[in-house]
């Protein structure tokens, strides 16, 4: 069952500017070591595209989960997006932030069992789309449906 969806678009030029003006420490508060390492391996414009899609992914995951949890903010580093050997993106739910926060804990709290992600770039834009899949709420209906459907209409 779909529990949440999230989408985000960011300008690649915005990420390029961030990379060129922020310190390594500041970038390390936005991206994981693995994400920064892969971007460095790609080099040049490809590194900016890579980081822009990762930034959009972090925002899209947050949007997909925001209505399912009391948390209205979380450390962006807990959303680590990597690629399988064949190039498909995936969200690594077991990455742990420096504060000990883990995406896996939020997924368990919200009943989300899988995050499906798609990312793309076009011109100066990077977009990520996320579907949060999970189990029904305690009443047997989706919590999101319970929010938008008046009780007498159920």
State what each model feature region is.
Residues 1-154:
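Core catalytic alpha/beta fold that binds nucleotide/phospho-ligands
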């Amino acid at each position: 069952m779909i529990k949440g969806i999230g989408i985000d678009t960011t300008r690649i030029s915005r990420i390029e500017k961030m990379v060129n003006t922020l310190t390594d420490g500041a970038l390390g508060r936005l991206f994981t070591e693995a994400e920064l390492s892969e971007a460095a391996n790609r080099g040049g414009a490809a590194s900016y595209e890579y980081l822009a899609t990762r930034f959009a992914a972090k925002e899209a995951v947050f949007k997909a989960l925001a209505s399912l949890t009391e948390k209205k903010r979380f450390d962006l580093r807990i959303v680590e997006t990597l690629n399988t050997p064949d190039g498909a993106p995936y969200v690594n739910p077991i990455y742990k932030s420096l504060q000990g926060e883990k995406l896996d804990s939020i997924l368990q709290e919200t009943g989300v069992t899988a995050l499906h992600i798609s990312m793309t770039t076009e011109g100066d834009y990077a977009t990520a789309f996320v579907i949060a899949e999970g189990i029904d709420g305690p009443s047997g209906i989706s919590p999101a449906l319970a929010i938008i459907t008046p009780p007498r209409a159920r």
